[in-house]
Design a protein with these regions (language model features):
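C2H2-type zinc-finger recognition helix
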Residues: 58
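GIY-YIG nuclease catalytic motif and its immediate N-terminal context
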Residues: 1-52, 62-69, 73-76, 80-86
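Short, surface-exposed polybasic/aromatic micro-patch for ligand or macromolecular engagement
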Residues: 55
Length: 86
């Protein structure tokens, strides 16, 4: 079983917001975020996955999720790379 760290993007009014998480079922988790059953922060928004990375263990994924959540520069670079291609 693999674990994934992912970055989601949503446009709210005139700006973009992001959400970082980890899971062992990426498709199901994104569907949950886009439904009313996702995390409290993600409810009611349309989320697009813009980054995901696979890890062999849950602890690796959790460590990388923590790093990505706290590395605003890296998140911004990922967002800019995605938005450049729109």
């Amino acid at each position: 079983m693999y674990f994934f760290v992912y970055l989601l993007l949503s446009k709210v009014k005139d700006r973009y917001i992001s959400y970082v998480g980890y899971t062992n079922n990426i498709e199901n988790r994104i569907n949950l975020h886009n439904s009313s059953k996702g995390a409290k922060f993600t409810k009611g928004k349309k989320w697009v996955p813009i980054y995901q990375k696979r890890y062999k263990t849950k602890s690796e994924a959790m460590r990388e999720e923590f790093k990505l959540k706290n590395d605003r520069k890296k998140r911004t670079l990922i967002k800019l790379k995605y938005l450049k291609h729109l």
